[in-house]
């Protein structure tokens, strides 16, 4: 073989090797799969230790590659988590009102406090001056979100309409989530008219709002901001200070629930944990907090690492 021919052979071989290497995709069996399996295992342990019934739904909002569903289609008492749907219908009607549709509730519509509207667990409304204090629907929504004021929630139910709330939910394909009564309606509760939801449908609702499938962008941002008001709740209890959580907890005898969007850095996720038949309310609250903590640790870590686990340099 001549020197020229040998050189040409080597060049061709090198080019072929490079081309072959460029055609091969990167391996997909990364450590993130193993990390997620560890999270699933720890959450399963939490669920097993809990003495009642627990339902869990977690979905990655970045690309949807990670999700965890445990008893997620089971129907639970929603408790005050149903107020998510009331808040959503209010914002939906506000969009309609601003577009000129008559008979829809707007966020800036006024309400004059009437003590006849008062029900139990109304921490703010019970201290207002009758026939003097005027509030907007936005104010009522803030009371409903921040301190779970039941009178504020009931006034908003009257204003947006229970049937409209359920119609909105049904239109989204959510058949297990229903507003069946006002807050503190003991007689209705005894009849079995419980406000209900499933973890999976609560997650679907929150995901649709986050992705702009229900409200327009500005309205969705306002809705999330209002729901992110700091309040006593279970999802953020063991998360680092400063993590934004747009959530609504709920509490009834034997029941604890919490559903929301957790804005972990670069990797937000949506979570709903619902419990029932709980002999120990504090244990139920702790179970929700423990599940949220495990989920957060995964998404927070994945938000700052490569697919293979290296913590990436900050910009």
Segments predicted by a language model, with ranges:
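Acidic helix-start/capping segments at beta-turn-to-alpha-helix junctions
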Residues: 61-62, 104-125, 160-161, 226, ...
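Extracytoplasmic
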Residues: 49-53, 71-73, 77-82, 106-108, ...
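Mid-domain, small-residue-enriched loop/turn segments at the edges of structured enzyme/sensor domains
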Residues: 53, 133, 153-206, 210-211
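Structured C-terminal helix/loop/strand segments within mature extracytoplasmic catalytic/sensor domains
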Residues: 23-49, 159-161, 204-234, 240, ...
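Bacterial N-terminal signal peptides
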Residues: 5-16
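Active-site SXXK
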Residues: 64, 77-111, 271
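Conserved catalytic neighborhood of penicillin-recognizing serine enzymes
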Residues: 116-154, 162
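A short, well-structured edge-of-sheet supersecondary motif
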Residues: 38-71
């Amino acid at each position: 073989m001549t020197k020229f021919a040998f050189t040409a052979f080597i060049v061709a071989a090198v080019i072929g090797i490079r081309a072959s290497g460029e055609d091969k995709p990167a391996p997909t069996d990364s450590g993130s799969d193993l990390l997620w399996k560890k999270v699933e295992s720890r959450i399963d342990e939490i669920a097993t230790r809990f003495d009642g019934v627990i339902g869990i739904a977690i979905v990655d909002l970045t690309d949807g590659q990670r999700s965890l569903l445990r008893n997620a289609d089971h129907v639970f008492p929603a408790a005050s988590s149903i107020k998510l749907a009331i808040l959503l219908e209010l914002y939906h009607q506000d969009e309609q009102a601003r577009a000129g549709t008559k008979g829809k509730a707007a966020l800036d519509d006024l309400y004059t406090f009437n003590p006849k509207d008062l029900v139990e667990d109304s921490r703010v409304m019970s201290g207002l001056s009758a026939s003097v204090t005027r509030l907007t629907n936005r104010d009522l929504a803030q009371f409903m979100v921040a301190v779970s004021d039941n009178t504020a929630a009931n006034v908003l139910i009257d204003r947006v309409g229970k049937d409209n709330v359920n119609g909105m939910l049904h239109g989204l394909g959510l058949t297990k989530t229903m507003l069946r009564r006002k807050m503190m309606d003991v007689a209705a509760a005894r009849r079995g008219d419980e406000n209900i939801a499933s973890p999976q449908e609560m997650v679907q609702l929150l995901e649709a709002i986050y992705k702009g499938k229900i409200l327009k962008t500005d309205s969705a941002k306002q809705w999330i901001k209002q729901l992110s008001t700091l309040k006593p709740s279970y999802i953020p209890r063991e998360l680092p200070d400063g993590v934004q959580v747009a959530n609504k907890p709920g509490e009834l005898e034997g029941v604890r629930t919490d559903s929301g969007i957790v804005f972990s850095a670069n990797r937000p996720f949506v979570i709903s944990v619902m419990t029932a038949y709980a002999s120990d309310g504090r244990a139920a609250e702790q179970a929700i907090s423990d599940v949220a903590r495990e989920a957060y640790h995964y998404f927070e870590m994945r938000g700052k690492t490569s697919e293979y686990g290296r913590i990436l340099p900050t910009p």
